[in-house]
A protein has these predicted regions:
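Thiol-based oxidoreductase modules, predominantly thioredoxin-like and allied folds used
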Residues: 2-5, 24, 36-43, 47-62
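A short beta-strand-turn-helix
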Residues: 2-19
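Short loop/turn elements that flank and shape the SAM/SAH-binding pocket of Class I
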Residues: 10-12, 60-63
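Alpha/beta-hydrolase fold active-site loops
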Residues: 19-20, 73
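Short pre-active-site segment immediately N-terminal to redox-active cysteine/selenocysteine motifs
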Residues: 25-28, 71
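Short, thiol/selenol-centered motifs that function as redox-active sites or metal-ligating centers
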Residues: 28-35
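ABC family nucleotide-binding domain
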Residues: 30, 43, 66-69
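Non-catalytic, surface beta->alpha helical segment in thiol-disulfide oxidoreductase systems
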Residues: 71-89
């Protein structure tokens, strides 16, 4: 699983080909921490089919807002630079 930051998000997600799952999480977010092991398990199982990434929104608030991530945790699927689906838990 690739850990993103505000400097790598564009190249690794918005400019990357194919499908990419991004786990938007935050420091101190209990539901985020509970979800993280499941996302890592999916990455191990399906990592050859989809790129798995995570972004700590505590360190990239403006980026999260630009992606319309207003609550946490958010799991988003990107394809060819566009968010095509998302889920807020």
């Amino acid at each position: 699983m690739l850990e993103l930051d505000k400097n790598t998000f564009e190249a690794e997600v918005l400019q990357a080909p194919g499908k990419i799952l991004v786990d938007f999480y935050g420091d101190g977010c209990v539901p985020c921490a509970a979800l993280m092991p499941h996302i890592h398990a999916f990455a191990e199982t399906y990592g050859d089919k989809i790129k798995f990434c995570a972004l700590n929104t505590t360190k990239a608030r403006r980026l999260a807002i630009s992606q319309k991530v207003l609550g946490l945790p958010v799991i988003a699927i990107y394809e060819n630079g566009e968010m095509i689906d998302s889920c807020v838990k």
